[in-house]
């Protein structure tokens, strides 16, 4: 994953948000809409699982950990199950939509 010198010690996306607060507000609004809006055909757990997998592909440990924890909560599965999905999502027991 590419790295930008942010001049702060905040982990993950929190550092980016603090670096450019003027862009943080619309980005946070977008994230809230994508991940938590109830008018969606994917469950919150499925959306967090997508965030987990994308963050895994981007090699962002912070983001995949946060999204993975939320996906585990919503989908009632443990960290090992989330890790198994990241390693081999094509053979994971996921919904047809996923």
Segments and roles (model prediction):
Residues 1-98:
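Hydrophobic alpha-helical segments
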